[in-house]
Amino acid sequence: MIVNKKNICMSVYNTIISRRSIRRFKNKPIKIEILKKLINAARLAPSGANLQVLEYIVVFDKYLCSKIFDTIGWAGYIKPTWKPFEEERPTSYIIVLTNDIENKYYLRDVGLATENILLTAESENIGSCILCNINRDEIRKFLDISDSLYIDSVIALGYKGEQPVIENMKNSVEYWRDENKVLHVPKRSLKDIIHINKFSKT
């Protein structure tokens, strides 16, 4: 079989530029085979010194998903305080853990592994959102997580119930919802962050 590398590269790039953080989901379960695929993508991410200090809990049980939902702070920039309606909640979660909080590479590993999860989810048309405003003590308690593991973050997952749009960033990094409940996300322009051959002040 002839593999078109150009098409593969474009597919990867298109997946990257189409991915947005999703906070409203469809009430449709994700198959366990797909959830395992996401973890396998994380497993194969680069790891500082190849120490591989991350572990993951996959949660799709409805009762446990409800418990996790109650520990999460959602969309901090949106006022008044907002959270998804019951029918818009994530149908699965991934809890990201490290077994070595003192490892100097651990945060870099988390970034690499979680991006693999998000992009693989996007390729399956599954929305995702990394959440760090969480009640770690409560999550530890009802998921029976050992004290030797640090809970870094939670990734919410579900089939997309919204499609946020990108806006050119002007005066603020804060995202907002319009009157049609569409989420608008400011991003810095390419020309504002790229420097060719040397650093440019303008």
Segments predicted by a language model, with ranges:
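Acidic, surface-exposed loops and disordered segments
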Residues: 1-202
